């Protein structure tokens, strides 16, 4: 066992002395040491319950003959960090999560890991660490919250964001917004729709790194605690079997995850996180081209908020990710090994799809193509991403004049100041990994546009979007403006064309005009210090996952 490094031989007497002070008995030194990486915090609703799940994991580890050691890492709530400087730290925190899990596992020679994340950047950060460490690991995601109810309809947090714009447009009273605010999130856990946190939980299960049913098992259900306990038992078996993450997270497994992502119409942030996780494993090639290729083959089969009226609860009742995999079985790689020790085929052999109005059959999809599309052109030579499954049919192709802003904050002033007109293409630039720095999410602008009823306004940015964004919103434009990307050459009034079916994002400028404007472009100066200053120096481009270089 790897833990023998700290517990075997006369030279390890000091180590054993310290470990005994943690309560270990002589017998415990014969057992595998299992780390439980817990991202509990009481300021993040998606993580406030993880202490309880950690206890269930410990019960499982102990019952299977292991020794459980719990440690913590950080967690940021994107909803609370939204629309202020705090959002600059969100994507950057993914790297800190990965580094802290790696550091704890290596420093203490752990034999295996149970990873306990819930929200947006914590899930990929922990998976990056698992891939990097390559010791047996299993993930227990925290689970979605139940949907709220407002005036007889199901609602979630995105309805509150959009409600701000609706109030501004005079279509809702402040009292109604306050009522919506109180009932949209009926309890803690991850938001009720298919936003980034729940998308990443689904893809973790599709990768084979969580037990079947884990992603959609709601946090309030006893099933979630059972899965946590079973995961604790299973990790001890995985250590005995030497079943490592690189044996599970193969090229084919990542392709399965991308197919599930496209079928569900998941968050655009997956085009950052899936390549970033894969980058930790030698020999894998997971890039935007793969998303583009598969999006033309895999249909969008589940209309879940923000793209539709269904919630994660509906997906769970329809059979969850096992049912999605079953529906896609003619496309997916069924021989991939999973954390169960069995193949995908064995896991889904007896699965039945519960509600075909939630998980549609392949011959009757929501859309004929996958939920995400990769656009390229003279504005995005290295690519950009749009959640096409959440774009209205009449906005799949749009041409309009640019309204250019050098930050999210400038754009928000213009939106609420009534300076955005139907037909405009909003450009928010210098918000990329280096430009922000930190590649902030543009949920406030997109929600304000939707809430104010501006149905023919598009938005493009080198920043990101929340998984809750809907509409003709194109993000991750690469290269970013701060790195002399063409977005820096756009002026107010330039005609921009978005053609999602043709996968094009272009501005009506010649190559020479773009080059001349870039030479005279003045980049905003943004003074940052501490971690953000280091992140700005090291962050890579969005088209390769914005990983540190």
Swiss-Prot record:
It is an enzyme of class 4 (lyase). Its EC number is 4.2.1.9. Pathway: Amino-acid biosynthesis; L-isoleucine biosynthesis; L-isoleucine from 2-oxobutanoate: step 3/4; Amino-acid biosynthesis; L-valine biosynthesis; L-valine from pyruvate: step 3/4. [2Fe-2S] cluster binds at residues 119, 191. The active site is at 466 (proton acceptor). SUPFAM superfamilies: IlvD/EDD N-terminal domain-like (SSF143975), LeuD/IlvD-like (SSF52016). Its cofactor is [2Fe-2S] cluster; Mg(2+). It catalyses: (2R)-2,3-dihydroxy-3-methylbutanoate = 3-methyl-2-oxobutanoate + H2O; (2R,3R)-2,3-dihydroxy-3-methylpentanoate = (S)-3-methyl-2-oxopentanoate + H2O. Mg(2+) binds at residues 78, 120-121, 441. It comes from the Archaea. GO terms for molecular function: 2 iron, 2 sulfur cluster binding; dihydroxy-acid dehydratase activity; magnesium ion binding. Pfam families: ILV_EDD_C, ILVD_EDD_N. Binds 1 [2Fe-2S] cluster per subunit. This cluster acts as a Lewis acid cofactor. One of its GO terms (biological process) is isoleucine biosynthetic process. The modification N6-carboxylysine is found at residue 121. One of its GO terms (cellular component) is cytosol. Keywords: 2Fe-2S, Amino-acid biosynthesis, Branched-chain amino acid biosynthesis, Iron, Iron-sulfur, Lyase, Magnesium, Metal-binding. PANTHER family: D-XYLONATE DEHYDRATASE, D-XYLONATE DEHYDRATASE YAGF-RELATED. Belongs to the IlvD/Edd family. Functions in the biosynthesis of branched-chain amino acids. Catalyzes the dehydration of (2R,3R)-2,3-dihydroxy-3-methylpentanoate (2,3-dihydroxy-3-methylvalerate) into 2-oxo-3-methylpentanoate (2-oxo-3-methylvalerate) and of (2R)-2,3-dihydroxy-3-methylbutanoate (2,3-dihydroxyisovalerate) into 2-oxo-3-methylbutanoate (2-oxoisovalerate), the penultimate precursor to L-isoleucine and L-valine, respectively. Homodimer. This is Dihydroxy-acid dehydratase. It comes from Methanothermobacter thermautotrophicus (strain ATCC 29096 / DSM 1053 / JCM 10044 / NBRC 100330 / Delta H) (Methanobacterium thermoautotrophicum).
């Amino acid at each position: 066992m790897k833990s023998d490094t700290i517990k075997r031989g006369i030279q390890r007497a000091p180590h054993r002395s310290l470990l005994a002070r943690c309560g270990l008995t002589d017998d415990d030194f014969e057992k595998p040491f299992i780390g439980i990486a817990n991202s509990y915090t009481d300021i993040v609703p998606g993580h406030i319950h993880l202490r309880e799940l950690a206890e269930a994991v410990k019960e499982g580890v102990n019952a299977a003959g292991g020794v459980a050691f719990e440690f913590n890492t950080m967690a940021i709530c994107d909803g609370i960090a939204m629309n202020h400087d705090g959002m600059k730290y969100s994507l950057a925190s993914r790297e800190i999560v990965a580094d802290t899990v790696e550091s704890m596992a290596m420093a203490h020679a752990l034999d295996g890991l149970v990873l306990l994340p819930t929200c947006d950047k914590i899930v990929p950060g922990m998976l990056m660490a698992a891939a990097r460490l390559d010791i047996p690991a299993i993930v227990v995601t925290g689970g979605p919250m139940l949907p709220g109810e407002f005036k007889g309809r199901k609602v979630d947090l995105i309805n509150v964001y959009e409600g701000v714009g609706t109030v501004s447009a005079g279509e809702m009273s402040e009292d109604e917004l306050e009522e919506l605010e109180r009932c949209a999130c009926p309890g803690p856990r991850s938001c009720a729709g298919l936003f980034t946190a729940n998308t990443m939980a689904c893809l973790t299960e599709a990768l084979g790194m969580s037990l079947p049913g884990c992603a959609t098992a709601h946090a309030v259900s006893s099933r979630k605690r059972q899965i946590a306990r079973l995961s604790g038992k299973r990790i001890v078996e995985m250590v005995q079997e030497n079943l490592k993450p690189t044996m599970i997270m193969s090229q084919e497994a990542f392709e399965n995850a991308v197919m599930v992502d496209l079928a569900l119409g998941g968050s655009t942030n997956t085009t950052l996180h899936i390549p970033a996780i894969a980058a930790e494993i030698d020999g894998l090639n997971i890039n935007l081209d793969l998303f583009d290729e598969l999006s033309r083959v895999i249909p969008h089969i589940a209309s879940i908020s923000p793209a539709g009226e269904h919630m994660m609860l509906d997906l769970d009742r329809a059979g969850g990710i096992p049912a999605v995999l079953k529906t896609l079985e003619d496309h997916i790689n069924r021989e991939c090994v999973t954390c169960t020790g069995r193949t995908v085929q064995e896991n889904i052999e007896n699965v039945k799809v519960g509600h075909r109005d939630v998980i549609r059959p392949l011959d009757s999809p929501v859309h004929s193509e996958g939920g995400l599309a990769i656009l390229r052109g003279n504005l995005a030579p290295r690519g950009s991403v749009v959640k096409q499954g959440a774009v209205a049919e009449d906005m799949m192709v749009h041409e309009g004049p640019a309204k250019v802003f050098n930050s999210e904050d400038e754009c928000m002033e213009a939106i609420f100041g009534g300076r955005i007109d139907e037909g405009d293409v909003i450009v928010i630039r210098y918000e990329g990994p280096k430009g922000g720095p930190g590649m902030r999410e543009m949920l406030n602008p997109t929600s304000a546009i939707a809430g104010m009823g501006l149905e023919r306004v598009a938005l493009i940015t080198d920043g990101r979007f929340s998984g809750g964004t809907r509409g003709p919103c194109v993000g991750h434009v690469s290269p970013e403006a701060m790195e002399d990307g063409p977005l820096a050459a756009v002026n107010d009034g330039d005609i921009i064309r978005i053609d999602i079916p043709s996968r094009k994002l272009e501005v009506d400028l010649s190559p020479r005009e773009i080059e001349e404007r870039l030479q005279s472009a003045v980049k905003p100066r943004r003074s940052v210090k501490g971690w953000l200053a280091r992140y700005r120096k090291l962050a890579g481009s969005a088209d390769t996952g914005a990983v540190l270089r």
